Structure formats: C-alpha cells, structure tokens
Amino acid sequence: MNNYDEQPRRVVNADVGLNSFLTKMYGWMGLAVLLSAVSAYFFATSPALMSSFAGPSRWIILIVWFAFPFIVSGQALKRPALSFVLLMVYALITGAMFSGFALIYTGATITTAFVSSATVFIVMALYGTVTKRSLAKVGAQATAALIALIVAMVINMFLQSPMISYIFSFVGVIIFTALTASDSQKLKQLYLNSDGSGTASTGIAIIGAMQLYLDFVNLFLFLLEIFGGGNSRN
C-alpha cells in the first residue's frame, strides 16, 4: 500500500519542481528583457549617456558584451548568484547598446517589432515546453542554418546589399523562431535530467534565461529590420 501512496507523491513533487524551474527561468528571462527596455529608454533620452558609447570605449564595451554570455553560462552551476547578477548587468548593457535604434527607427516601428517578437517568443516557448515531439533535429538544423547565415552576413558586409540584408532578416526570424522552441524543450529536458537540487535548478534556470534572452533579442533585431524597411527616420 505504501508503494502506491509514494508513487503519486513523487510525481507531484517532480511537477512542483519543474514548475518552479520554469517559473524561475522564464521569470528571469522576462526580467532581463524588462531591464534592457528600461536601459534603452534612459540612454535614448539622455545624449550624455549615449555619448559614453562613442570613441575607443565602445570597443571595450563590445568585447565585454560578447564575453558575458560565456561567463554567465560557464559559472551558472558553480556560482549561481554571481551569474544571476552578471545576467542582469548584461541585459542593462544590451539595452544601452541598442538605445541608438531610437535614432534610426520610429517609436511605432520599435513597438511593433517588440510586440511581434514577444508574441512569437511566447507561442514558440510554450510549444517547445509542452510538445511531446522531439525538437532536437529542428534545433540542430536551425543552429547549422544560423552559422551559415552569420557567414553570409559577414560576406554581405563587403557587398553592402540592402536587399540581401533584408532577405537575411526573414531567414533570421525563421531560425530564431525554431531555436526558441527547441531551446525551451532542451532546457526543460536538461532540468529533468539533473538531480533537481536547488543549486542545479537555479544554475540551469540562469543558463536557460540567458539562452532564451539571446533568442528573443535576435528575434527582435531581425523583426526590427523587417518592419523598419520603410519606417526608419532616415
């Protein structure tokens, strides 16, 4: 009789742990997006702050910005508290770097791109979390396509073709739409394969928040270029 009583209890505990993990991961990812938006607004409305990214210092900031995701992911399981702080700092820096978009695109364009990105992200993250179908192959194909896209974008930096760049934006949206779903499923599975301890759960949640934040940011950037095709301030 005790065996029958314990089985439902273990299932309930597993569900509670998973729900707690998902709440932390998506909650921290959402907080990072919010901090980026606030940071972008303050920098965009303050010429003095925006000018801090001009000159040689911008290269230092750019290097730090590229290094942060690797540091956060590498330290998340060992030092989750430090990684959480670094994730939030990274979100603030990202928002500050993107504040210049306010000089290029109209407020309506930025808002449309943001709302569209949020809608696509929520739908695909939900799908990736609840679907029983394995998205590992989709994720691998999307990652390969992303590498090819990066190479093509570097080549187009020399060609400077606006049309090619515009087409790449649609490709980028497709890639990060797929990655959002596959990453959501992969991170859920990563938690389920862990020991479920508090430290492991928090560390994986931070890694997931960083990964999904990057998916959202890239989705936003590509949609911004699409919607901004005829709605820039130029």
Q: What are these model-predicted stretches?
A:
Residues 1-234:
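A hydrophobic alpha-helical transmembrane-helix feature that marks the membrane cores
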